[in-house]
Amino acid sequence: MNKSSRFYLKFISFIFILQFHSLLSDAQWYDPEKVNKKAREIYESAYEEAVQRKFTECLVHLEEALKLEPKFVEVYLSRAGIYADIKNYPLSVKDFETAFTMDSVFSDTYLLPFSISLAGTGQFDKALLTVNRFLATPGINDRSIKAANYRKSVYEFAIKYAAQHPAGKYIFAPENMGDSINTSDLEYFPSLTIDGKKMIFTRRINNDEDFYESNLINGTWSKALPVTGKINTNLNEGAQNISQDGQWLIFTGCNYPEGIGSCDLYIAYKTKNGGWTEPENLGPTVNTDFWESSPSLSPDKKDLYFASSQPGGFGGKDIWVSHRQPNGKWGRPRNLGADVNTDGDEGCPFIHADNRSLYFNSNGHMGYGMTDLYVSRKLDDSTWSTPDNLGYPINTIDDEGSLIVASDGRTSYYASEGLASRGGLDLYRFQLRDDIKAAKTLWVKGRVFDKKTKA
């Protein structure tokens, strides 16, 4: 293999995470000497930009190279990899198919990444056929076989799940929550009161995380503003949960001077003027020398669910629960057990207002390839059902974060890098399917008066 051929191989190896093709002994390539010299120079510049993850500039240069050399197959393959890296799977599939049409000698080498892009568009049947073709290719190495078999199991799971959970008339249609809430910065970790009229979420600006609040007024969300009080600091506050009645705010504070571990749980209380008290560390009963995050209060504020890396669990990060004692203190946390937790990581728990449906994410349960969203139902005080994957397209082949569900049991909110995003992660709302929704929860709003004083 000459120097230029190794260069092309290096380029595409960088783009595809698995880098399996760099180990194939029988890969065949175009003769670089027959490629337009200027196009090849532009392609080399694009490679340097890809190394620096300057994908926008890289894509521009790849397009320029194609104008000079319309049948430059490596450009299509490389661009397919970049599109996959930025999660534009439809364009990735299109470029793969164009390259394969031009020269089928490449198809055996690129069947595995092609299958991943197909899965990214939800074409799991075709992805399975493609990965099986790859596994039948002579001479592939053990690393490639292992990666392909893993992907095969994912595609088989997706096909089986779709058969067992027919969508019927259900349509997954995430709706961006608009400019009142979303900006060119990152918005994530939404939290909602039971009446659905107040949302608090995390916004990250220049790597600084703070809490913002928006109120639903006459059906429209107000422009989100930083929460008042002493909660937002020059440190990082995130992964918050507002109590169903809107009176408590529990959140994650990392690297605080008074912190016990790397990230601790803190609580603040609503004041009469609408602000928040100075946050209090929940103390060494809940917080450990390790990592605690993603709190979620039960509707009666008696149970606190959270994720932790403390010892005594099943994997790296598990979901735990602490019960509030009669004296108001939080009790020693209890691991939710092997039905919920795995030898992988579980996080972002959300206990619904029905006090039974627990939504969370995990990379340890079988799913679509990365971190997926699941729901488990409380059977009794210490037992949970086997988690149900929320399915495609709520879950994708990429990482999913947190999800919350409104009191109606169906309306859900989550953060996503959707095509309608203002920039990076935005907050979206959508409706859950019947089989994964929570129970509709009724609530009553009122005031309590003293019978004698009327106060």
Task: Tell what function each PLM region has.
Residues V35-L68:
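Alpha-helical segment of the N-proximal tetratricopeptide repeat
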